[in-house]
Amino acid sequence: MQELIARAKELLADGTVARVLGWKAGDLPYNPEAAYFETAESLDEFVYNGFCGQNLSKMMIEASKLEGKTLVCLKPCDTYSFNQLIKEHRVDREKAYIIGVGCKGKLDVEKLRKMGIKGIQSISGAELTDDCEILNVSTIYGDKTLAYKDAMLERCHVCKGKEHMIYDEIIGESKDTKDADRFAEVEKIEKMSPEERFAFFQKELSKCIRCNACRNACPACSCRKCVFDSTKFDSAQKANVDSFEEKMFHIIRAFHVAGRCTDCGECSRVCPQGIPLHLFNRKFIKDIDTFYGEYQAGADAESKGPLTSFTFDDVEPGVVAERG
């Protein structure tokens, strides 16, 4: 991390960038938050560790409107989102200085809680320079030790790879964390009967409190004005009118980002209710791969997505209906 801070200070000092977009410590050891740093002194508060899971690419939409370049720290999976935003003309590549930061998997504090680890005071073993094999957690109830991989976010177990798709320079080593099939959970749901699927999603989506965290964190949700904020559609309220409305919110949002979602997993990571929202998007990704050939949104900043282009080899719409 010190190398990252030192380089950021250099780029600020020589005028290459006007600000740095990274993370600073939050009020809890597992809760770093996104922050801008405009002076060398402020960078002393910069942090980067296993809990810095937030995808900063969406914040570059507003940063692109500011004077001067913004240095932004992007993990390998974040760079897919940035590429997709370039493709959609939502960010200005010339206004960004991208430092690709190493990643050895990001941590999910909810997994720690499910293990019964509470009252956390400090955590070691999650720094960029660590091997990220063992986590040592100090709590008010005593010390706990666990395997790093047991506390990783779901998305890290199905990682797309540790190669940065776009960058100006790379700092820090990455580590392969993939140990599961990306579509295993989707296939499990596909095998359910229609009644079982309905019951599964009814149970999960009934937890929704309509906080809009998923939409606000999602890089693919980049509309200047969201349809769900329009008073014309009676959907500006935060509390649900009925359970059906909440189901439609998530289903419609999934349709809106289909073909553009990079599967960054931010929707599920930020959900305070623990709803696996990424499963909707991953189902679309799986179907797109099946019908149009394997495609990864954000793998580059030029190619057209399968849902925004046409070829004579495209699957006929009836095939989807026949499959059921």
PLM feature spans:
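Generic structural signal for well-ordered, non-membrane alpha-helical segments
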Residues: 1-5, 211, 264, 277
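Active-site-adjacent beta-strand anchor residues
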Residues: 72-75, 208, 270
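Helix N-cap / loop-to-helix initiation motif
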Residues: 78, 214, 276-277
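Cysteine-cluster motifs in flexible loop/terminal segments that predominantly coordinate metals
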Residues: 149-166, 208-214, 221-226, 264-267
